[in-house]
Amino acid sequence: MTNTRKTHPLIKIINHSFIDLPAPSNISTWWNFGSLLGLCLVIQIFTGLFLAMHYTSDTMTAFSSVTHICRDVNYGWLIRYMHANGASMFFICLFLHVGRGMYYGSYTYFETWNIGVILLFMVMATAFMGYVLPWGQMSFWGATVITNLLSAIPYIGTTLVEWIWGGFSVDKATLTRFFAFHFILPFITTALVMVHLLFLHETGSNNPSGLISDSDKIPFHPYYTIKDILGALLLILILMILVLFSPDLLGDPDNYTPANPLSTPPHIKPEWYFLFAYAILRSIPNKLGGVLALVFSILILMLFPLLHLSKQRSMMFRPLSQCMFWILVADLITLTWIGGQPVEYPYIIIGQLASILYFAIILLILPTISLIENKLLKW
């Protein structure tokens, strides 16, 4: 008797992806974040869908509709805070997932890696537009500042900004289109995730040693399904602790004040997960230069496969590169801190040094260290 799981046209796709998939026997907890990102995406889509049922994308009623969700809708407060803090969990998992790829050399699967970078851009765009929707002070001024950056593009900049705004300032038209894009982008992201997985399953997973693991594979189910469920339960635990005990921990108090175009908040800053890029943007005193640095701070990830000069794939057996990698992590934490500080001495100079170090480590120091390590091993 033939097994439906292996013969049914639709079920066999699921089978080859999540059940009978040959997986390396030694992948660590760092490989859990892919499935956790999938879980985050599902949580965000469902909570977002229920929020959209009660939200109105009009400048006059947007702020009130969010208040209405929190006060009058059954468990509306829970859905709203799960969605807001779910975004934070999403980005924590994203950063750890990308960091894992950098550390273990997963970027050598360059189709998978490049689609991952595009996914990162898309999730960042989605999160930015979502932050505008509650129409608080930080929503309005964040949208104004970030969209205004496009005016730095020569010739077409001003026209482009006014086209995105749908007028001469951030207003009703901007809010409506941001809501539309915020709704559609997660579904496009989901489609891209499938392409990401398609390319990953062409090559199979990498593993901590960076060596080919074809000779030692185990089925995904039950080994990694159980492992992923454990990760998922821990993620939900952390998310719910955040939501139920301190839902506003990662938010900005300014966003509890309705948007007012006539009063600028003293410190305009984005959500915590954009602060590292915001710090890089602010560290360059030229508008166009800042915008380019901002874009390249993420786009630089696409260069990783080209900058890999080591004869080994993973950093597991490369102590010098490991050391530099953790300095890079510390640098990104420093940038995140600086992004939330006012533009004054000594924060300006710290931000500039941290930005220079960020690009120097990736473009210059890590490749150089890789060559030194090759020489030390007489390769």
From Swiss-Prot:
The keyword Ligase does not apply. A ubiquinone binds at residue 201. GO terms for molecular function: metal ion binding; ubiquinol-cytochrome-c reductase activity. The chain crosses the membrane at residues 33-53, 77-98, 113-133, 178-198, 226-246, 288-308, 320-340, 347-367. Disulfide bonds: none annotated. GO terms for cellular component: mitochondrial inner membrane; respiratory chain complex III. Heme b b566 binds at residues 97, 196. Binds 2 heme b groups non-covalently. It is found in: Mitochondrion inner membrane. Heme 1 (or BL or b562) is low-potential and absorbs at about 562 nm, and heme 2 (or BH or b566) is high-potential and absorbs at about 566 nm. Component of the ubiquinol-cytochrome c reductase complex (complex III or cytochrome b-c1 complex) that is part of the mitochondrial respiratory chain. The b-c1 complex mediates electron transfer from ubiquinol to cytochrome c. Contributes to the generation of a proton gradient across the mitochondrial membrane that is then used for ATP synthesis. Belongs to the cytochrome b family. This is Cytochrome b. The gene is MT-CYB.
